[in-house]
């Protein structure tokens, strides 16, 4: 069936900011789709609010709109661009929900726009819990006994009939938002209330819990001719009850018999055909381990996180082909880009095993509830490929970057019996390590199976790994056992620990017996057909399939799994660096392990190695490829941390030298450099003990900013106001010693400014200066950034340009650098210099049209800025105003304090642009999910230090018609200033308290700067959490509140009566 020629323009809806449940996989899918549609000759219009994505690059579509994905803005784009069709199935839950909203509002009919891929009826049947259940009943496919509920009373009725436990699944939500397993009435009340609030149609499915069944997923494709095929089947190691995004997953499934596999395959194909989906679809099934009984859990009628994993696991580009199917092409017409000879309807065959392990942010959120359930909590994931499950699993473990290079975690090994039991029976993010610890202590696989319902096959494989550990320890330097351990995925570092020698000695032993990995190709067909994909994984076998080319090559290290502090921004820079290397005439090679990202799409680089980012794994690739050098600037802290080990092994680090990187990152060396350059910084010193830290703080005066050296995302950073708080920080937050010093600085509460620059060693280009709306003390990644800076004098700007130029040349930076300053009056202090790409680089690249990672890479390869056509100094500022607004995932992470400080908490970002700051901010807030009410009630409860400032804010809120509510202390201050205020009771007082007002929806905005404590029992913590749980915007910085207020003021009108007697009264605005 030829592609459709009755449509010319297609609107692709992106997925918006990165949040838990919807990460970089949709940048990968959207990028593939846009390129695929352009390849077929269609005019592509894209809307997405996330500037940190490749898909929002100008080259990806004919028209790119970085605008809020809301009904209002998408409708405007449709009316302006007049597309013939929209493709919403590549924008995750955001894209699907937007399509449903556009349809319900009549926009699609009004503008005569067709929905491609999956029609709205199919979306409704899959997403609406009631319609889905009805369809399964029609097909005769079993679903767990369930009921659709719209309120708590209906939930009670269902539980009375079925009994506990029950699973709550809200309709039209992402990553299981608001859902969970309920074992008692208290859990039922909490989960159902939260689920109904988060569901856009106020609907939840309550179903009988089938926790303990095997969870299996099928990734399927179908075209308009009703051809359907399975791309990949995947098995969750964790049984039903844990969200698939939080589960360890293996592909292909390992424990299904052929009969079970075919049974579930047939069901999946039957469902995609019944829904008449044209494109990709994910079917989740539950299989009774003791019979052939199964249940259909749910269907995602779109490209998903699992599609990205299936694409990378098989090499089969699902999103690219789904876009082609959406425009009428069929599976038997489209060639498989991997083989170039077979067609897309051939089902991929794997002759290897793939392991996926989720990456969580609990290192950032120590207070978070780590218990896993049906609501997703992981921020990212890693994937590894091996010839056996054991090998793939161990490679995935060391890809996680959690300080473990094996199934060995200190906390698990040192845990008492009670903790060990709890961690095994009630799964948390680190259960895998506790299972290994239990096996080391002699628990049997049968005992562990009874407690966890994890299949005996996986537990047996774990026990074999532990057995091999013991044999290693008993036979030091035994060549046969060394070879066996390497085949099973053991790292040199772990073997060295077993044998009590250093890692280099293991490498030397392997070298002596020529024990090195070979690289195998991912080809979708188990080598049945000729394939030319440059996509490889390592394993300890005989035949090597990766042949070094005659062309000079450069290796770029990726940034690994997405986590808070190191997000998709670094993948963006990695991809641009690869493109620049190719433009400069070299072969570009990527090493990375994140299945969600664009960088691990094999068509991006000349060669892709899907490997852990450890010294050992990276060195093996370097030894086989013999590159000109390695680029570490774009892979975040992951890549920077490898530079030292690589250099010691004789590898050339391209760009800024290791010594100069250390001068920027090592506190004492940095201070010396600043002294020579005569650039001021806030007073401070390095401390290597608790006593030293107290002395430094006493000398410079409180408050002080404390943080460990060499961190990303403000890990363990805090503003400390007293000696007692400092002692608590030093003993709880960090392990201070001479090897890991702590920096203690005077805290300057000024205006924070951020600069990204590129240096070729002589010339320095500054694309832009960004100012932060929140004052210093809030992590730059959590601040609203504004470009061009609005509040800086010309003198301050000139100083910043001067300091940036001097720092770049003085530190011998070659490539990119990011500098953070604090401005106090007309004084400028440098806070820190990062000699690498930053999380603001994609934002600044988009708005200044200077492709920073591309230019920096050309400079790293030896070109200079002037020859590349750039004038040194600050680039001319744009007329429009751009803002970068952070996006948080607090709703997914219960028990986490939402207050902002020096440690980063946001998972993603959006951009707003317009002709005024207020309009740009409005777009940014709306795109980030902040509800902007033009009137309502503001709850103010602020610390004493903020009361004076709060009075001014309250006056302005009152003037535009908002009601002010405040707790006793704040209310008294406002009354003294003659501002109308309703006093509300604090938590714990009798009668209705402020928490009741928040829960009852009587508050539209909360401004809370009350307590800095992290303990959940603190009032401020409870106020902030309740606000998040109830979808109410909460500002923990008066600067953010002022920004929202500016927007609201700009949207209000003057209202003044004509009575002469009232003319002298202050003007009211609404």
Swiss-Prot record:
Residues annotated as binding Mg(2+) 3: 820, 832
Family to which the UniProt record says this protein belongs: Belongs to the CarB family.
The record's free-text note on cofactor binding: Binds 4 Mg(2+) or Mn(2+) ions per subunit.
Residues binding Mg(2+) 4, per UniProt: 832, 834
Catalytic activity entry: hydrogencarbonate + L-glutamine + 2 ATP + H2O = carbamoyl phosphate + L-glutamate + 2 ADP + phosphate + 2 H(+)
Annotated organism of origin: Listeria innocua serovar 6a (strain ATCC BAA-680 / CLIP 11262)
Gene it is expressed from: carB
Chain positions covered by the region annotation Carboxyphosphate synthetic domain: 1-401
Binding-site list for ATP 1: 129, 169, 175-176, 208, 210, 215, 241-243, 284, 298
Keyword S-adenosyl-L-methionine attached: no
Oligomerization domain, as annotated region: 402-546
Biological-process GO terms, alphabetical: 'de novo' UMP biosynthetic process; glutamine metabolic process; L-arginine biosynthetic process
Region (Allosteric domain): 930-1070
Cell membrane listed as a keyword: no
Record's protein name: Carbamoyl phosphate synthase large chain
HAMAP family: CPSase_L_chain_A, CPSase_L_chain_B
Pfam families recorded: CPSase_L_D2 (PF02786), CPSase_L_D3 (PF02787), MGS (PF02142)
Positions annotated to bind ATP 2: 707, 746, 748, 752, 777-780, 820, 832
UniProt function note: Large subunit of the glutamine-dependent carbamoyl phosphate synthetase (CPSase). CPSase catalyzes the formation of carbamoyl phosphate from the ammonia moiety of glutamine, carbonate, and phosphate donated by ATP, constituting the first step of 2 biosynthetic pathways, one leading to arginine and/or urea and the other to pyrimidine nucleotides.
Lineage of the organism: Bacteria, Bacillati, Bacillota, Bacilli, Bacillales
Domain MGS-like: 930-1070
PANTHER family reported for this sequence: CARBAMOYL-PHOSPHATE SYNTHASE [AMMONIA], MITOCHONDRIAL, CARBAMOYLTRANSFERASE FAMILY MEMBER
Cofactor: Mg(2+); Mn(2+)
Binding, Mn(2+) 2: 298, 300
């Amino acid at each position: 069936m030829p592609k459709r020629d009755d449509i010319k323009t297609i609107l692709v809806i992106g997925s918006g900011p990165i949040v838990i449940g919807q990460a970089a996989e949709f940048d990968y899918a959207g990028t593939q789709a846009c390129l695929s549609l352009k390849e077929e000759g269609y005019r592509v219009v894209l809307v997405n609010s996330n500037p940190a994505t490749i898909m929002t690059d100008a080259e990806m579509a004919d028209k790119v709109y970085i605008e809020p994905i809301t009904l209002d803005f998408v409708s405007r784009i449709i009316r302006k661009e007049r597309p013939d069709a929209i493709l919403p199935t590549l924008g995750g839950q955001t894209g699907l929900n937007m399509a449903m909203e556009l349809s319900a509002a009549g926009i699609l009919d009004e503008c005569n726009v067709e929905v491609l891929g999956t029609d709205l009826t199919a979306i409704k049947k899959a997403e609406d819990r009631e319609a889905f259940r009805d369809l399964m009943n029609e097909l005769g496919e079993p679903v767990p006994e369930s009921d659709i509920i719209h309120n708590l009373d209906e939930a009670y009725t269902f539980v009375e009939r079925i009994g506990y436990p029950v699973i709550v699944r809200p309709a039209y939500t992402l990553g299981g938002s608001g859902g969970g397993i309920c074992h008692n009435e208290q859990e039922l009340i909490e989960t159902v209330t939260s689920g109904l609030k988060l569901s856009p149609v106020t609907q939840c499915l309550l179903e009988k819990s089938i926790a303990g069944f095997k969870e299996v997923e099928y990734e399927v494709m179908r075209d308009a001719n009703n051809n359907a095929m399975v791309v990949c089947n995947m098995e969750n190691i964790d049984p039903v009850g844990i969200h698939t995004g939080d589960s360890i997953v293996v592909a292909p499934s390992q424990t299904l018999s052929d009969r079970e596999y075919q049974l579930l395959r047939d069901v999946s194909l039957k469902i995609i055909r019944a829904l008449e989906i044209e494109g990709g679809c994910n079917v989740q099934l539950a299989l009774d381990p003791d019979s052939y009984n199964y249940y259909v859990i749910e269907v995602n009628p779109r490209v998903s996180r699992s599609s990205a994993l299936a694409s990378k696991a098989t090499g089969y580009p699902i999103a690219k082909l789904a876009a082609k199917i959406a425009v009428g092409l069929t599976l038997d017409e489209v060639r498989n880009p991997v083989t170039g000879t077979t067609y897309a309807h051939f089902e991929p065959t794997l002759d290897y095993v793939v392991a996926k392990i989720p990456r969580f942010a609990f290192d950032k959120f120590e207070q978070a509830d780590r218990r896993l359930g049906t609501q997703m909590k992981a921020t990212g994931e890693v994937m590894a490929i091996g010839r056996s499950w054991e090998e793939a699993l161990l490679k995935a473990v060391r890809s996680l970057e959690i300080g473990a290079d094996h199934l060995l975690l200190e906390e698990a090994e040192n845990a008492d019996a009670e903790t060990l039991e709890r961690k095994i029976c009630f799964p948390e993010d680190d259960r895998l390590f506790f299972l290994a610890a239990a096996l080391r202590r002699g628990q049997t696989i049968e005992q562990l199976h009874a407690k966890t319902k994890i299949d005996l096959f996986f537990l047996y494989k774990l026990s074999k790994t532990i057995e091999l550990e013991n044999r290693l320890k008993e036979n030091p330097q035994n060549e046969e056992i060394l070879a066996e351990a390497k085949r099973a995925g053991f790292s040199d570092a772990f073997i060295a620990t077993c044998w009590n020698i250093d890692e280099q000695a293991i490498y030397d032993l392997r070298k002596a017996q020529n024990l090195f990995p070979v690289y195998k190709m991912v080809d979708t067909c188990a080598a049945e057909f000729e394939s030319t994909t440059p996509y490889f994984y390592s394993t300890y076998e005989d035949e090597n399939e990766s042949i070094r080319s005659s062309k000079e090559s450069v290796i770029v290290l990726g940034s690994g799994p997405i986590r808070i502090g190191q997000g998709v921004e670094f993948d963006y820079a990695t991809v641009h660096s690869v493109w620049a290397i190719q433009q400069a005439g070299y072969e570009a090679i990527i090493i990375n392990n994140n299945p969600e990202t664009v960088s691990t799409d094999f068509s991006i680089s000349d060669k892709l190695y899907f490997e852990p980012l450890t010294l050992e794994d990276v060195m093996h690739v370097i030894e086989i490829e013999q590159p000109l050098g390695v680029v570490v600037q774009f892979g975040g802290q992951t890549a920077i941390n490898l530079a030292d080990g690589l250099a010691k092994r004789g590898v050339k680090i391209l760009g800024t030298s290791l010594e100069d990187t250390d001068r920027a990152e090592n506190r004492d060396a940095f201070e010396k450099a600043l002294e020579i350059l005569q650039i001021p910084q806030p007073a401070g010193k390095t401390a290597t003990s608790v006593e030293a830290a107290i002395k430094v703080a006493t000398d410079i005066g409180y408050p002080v900013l404390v943080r460990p050296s060499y961190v990303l995302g403000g890990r363990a950073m805090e503003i400390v106001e007293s000696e007692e708080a400092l002692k608590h920080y030093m003993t709880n937050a960090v392990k201070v010693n001479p090897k890991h010093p702590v920096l203690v600085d005077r805290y300057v509460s000024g205006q924070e400014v951020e600069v990204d620059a590129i240096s070729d060693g002589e010339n320095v280009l500054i694309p832009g200066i960004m100012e932060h709306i929140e004052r210093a003390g809030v992590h730059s990644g959590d601040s609203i950034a504004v470009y061009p800076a609005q509040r800086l004098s010309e003198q301050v700007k000139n100083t910043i340009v001067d300091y940036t130029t001097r720092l770049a040349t003085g530190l011998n930076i070659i490539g990119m650098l990011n500098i953070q300053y604090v401005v106090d009056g007309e004084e400028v202090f440098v806070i820190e210099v990062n000699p690498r790409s930053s999380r603001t680089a994609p934002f600044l690249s988009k708005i200044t049209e200077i492709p920073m990672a591309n230019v920096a890479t050309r400079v790293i390869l030896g070109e200079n800025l002037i020859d590349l056509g750039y004038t040194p100094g600050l680039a001319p500022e744009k007329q429009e105003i751009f803002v970068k607004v952070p996006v948080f995932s607090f709703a997914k992470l219960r028990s986490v304090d939402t207050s902002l400080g020096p440690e980063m908490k946001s998972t993603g970002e959006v951009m707003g642009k317009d002709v005024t700051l207020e309009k740009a901010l409005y777009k940014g807030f709306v795109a980030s999910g902040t509800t902007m009410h033009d009137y309502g009630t503001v709850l103010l409860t602020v610390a004493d230090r903020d009361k004076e400032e709060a009075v001014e804010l309250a006056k302005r809120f009152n003037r535009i018609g908002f009601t002010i509510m405040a707790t006793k202390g704040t209310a008294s201050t406002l009354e003294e200033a003659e501002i109308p205020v309703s006093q509300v009771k604090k938590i714990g007082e009798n009668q209705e308290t402020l928490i009741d007002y928040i829960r009852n929806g009587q508050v539209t905005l909360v401004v809370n700067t009350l307590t800095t404590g992290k303990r959940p029992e603190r009032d401020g913590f409870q106020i902030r959490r309740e606000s998040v749980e109830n979808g109410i915007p909460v500002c923990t910085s008066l600067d953010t509140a002022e920004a929202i207020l500016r927007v609201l003021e700009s949207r209000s009108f003057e209202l003044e009566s004509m009575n002469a007697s009232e003319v002298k009264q202050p003007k009211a605005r609404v």
